Amino acid sequence: MPKREKIQEMFDNIAPEYDRLNHIMSLDVDKTWRKRALTQIFKQTVGEPELEAEGCGMKVLDIACGTGDFSIAIAEEMVRRAKRCHQQGTDPSRCPGHVTGLDLSSGMLEIMGKKVEAKGLRDMISYEVGDCEHLRFEDGAFDRVTVAFGVRNFENREACLKEMLRVLRLGSRASR
C-alpha cells in the first residue's frame, strides 16, 4: 500500500480521537505552536498592496488541515481584523477573507465540518479532500499557504512544496 493510502487510512481511523491525542502527546504545546504560526500568517510583508493593512480579504490555503483547528484559528483572527478594518473604513466586500482546508482524510474533514458549523464559520471556511502533490487551484490563487503539522506525512515533499509555491500569489508567503 502506498504511503499516501496508509496515511489516509490511519487518520481516518484516529479522527474521532485525534484532537485529544494531539493535545496529550504534545503536552498542549500544539496550541502554542498554532498561536506562533498565526502571527506569521498575518505578518505583513513589503510589497503586498493587494491586502489591506489588517490582512482583510486574505485567501489562505491550509494544507493537511486535519480537524480544522488551525483553519478555524485563522478565520477567527480574520473576523477580529475585519472588525478593525470596518472601523477604518475598509470596503466590507474585501473582509474578512477565506480559508480553504485540504486534507487526505475524509474522517478528519468530517470532524472539521462539525467544528466549522458550530463556530458559525461556514461562509469563511471551505474544506475538501485533496493531495498537496496535485493541487486543483489556479496559479497564484492564495495570499498565504500553510502546513501546521503535516509535512512529516508528505509522500513527495518536493512536489508538495512546488505546488504550494505555484498556488501562492507572487510576493506572498508560505509557513509551517
PLM region spans:
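A short glycine-rich, Lys/Arg-flanked "PGG" loop and its adjoining helix->strand segment in the class I
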Residues: 158-173
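A short acidic, Gly/Pro-enriched loop at the edge of an enzyme's catalytic core
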Residues: 133-145
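Hydrophobic beta-strand segment of the Class I
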Residues: 18, 145-146
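Class I SAM-dependent methyltransferase Rossmann-like catalytic core
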Residues: 15-29
